[in-house]
């Protein structure tokens, strides 16, 4: 079989796989037409590789998209609603690790693009950390930092250093043990282990069975216990 025949065979196989993989209930020719009508991004107009900036620098996102219908833009940074303009400027105001999300949508659906921006230099060693339990039913716990030298407070430190990731619900305590910081929350992301200087997350355990987590107590280099409702 020559290359031309092989290409036709592969194209037929791919088309067949797409049609076969669609269920009768949620995927038909109309669905394929909708996919073809979604906003299309022009190659090279949205970064594909992670970006590193220094404090004080900025980066301008200026994607070029096309669609037979009107296109709507929605920008998020670490989960926060930032802009609905076609372009977006990321300002590296302080050290952080951020996830920028662009949603391109029209009446047929939505296309989502993600990009990570690193601004190195996080240092939370010259002050104290404040564990906020959060507003139950509305949001997760968080970490704030009081800077002794600047006499200022920075909020949402953990979230801003971990690409928008959040602690669990109703955060209770933070324990410094063997050079790591262990933060306990009652629900969801119940134990998060991080570097105490940068607050970069290194590990997490998600949900601990059906128990609430209150405090971590280190025993040795290999083991520790977590209190829950008066028990270990």
Where are these regions (language model features)?
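Bacterial Sec-dependent N-terminal signal peptides
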Residues: 2-9, 13-51, 108-128
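Repeated scaffold domains used in trafficking and secretory/extracellular systems
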Residues: 166-173, 210-221
């Amino acid at each position: 079989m020559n290359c031309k025949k092989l290409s036709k065979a592969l194209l037929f196989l791919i088309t067949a796989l797409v049609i076969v993989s669609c269920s009768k209930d949620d995927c038909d020719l109309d669905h394929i037409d909708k996919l073809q009508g979604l906003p299309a991004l022009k190659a090279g107009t949205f970064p594909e590789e992670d970006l590193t900036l220094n404090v004080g620098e900025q980066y301008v996102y200026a994607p070029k998209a096309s669609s037979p219908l009107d296109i709507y833009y929605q920008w998020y940074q670490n989960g926060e609603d930032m802009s609905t303009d076609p372009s977006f400027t990321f300002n590296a105001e302080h050290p952080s690790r951020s996830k920028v999300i662009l949603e391109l949508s029209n009446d047929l659906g939505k296309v989502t693009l993600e990009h990570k921006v690193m601004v190195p230099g996080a240092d939370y060693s010259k002050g104290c950390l404040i564990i906020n339990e959060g507003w139950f039913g509305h949001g997760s716990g968080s970490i704030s930092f009081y800077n002794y030298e600047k006499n200022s407070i920075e909020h949402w430190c953990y979230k801003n250093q971990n690409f928008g990731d959040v602690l669990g619900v109703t955060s209770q305590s933070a324990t410094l043990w063997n050079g790591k910081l262990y933060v306990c929350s009652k629900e969801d992301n119940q134990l998060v282990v991080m570097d105490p200087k940068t607050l970069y997350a290194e590990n997490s355990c998600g949900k601990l069975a059906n128990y609430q987590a209150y405090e971590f107590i280190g025993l040795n280099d290999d083991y520790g216990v977590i209190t829950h409702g008066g028990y270990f």
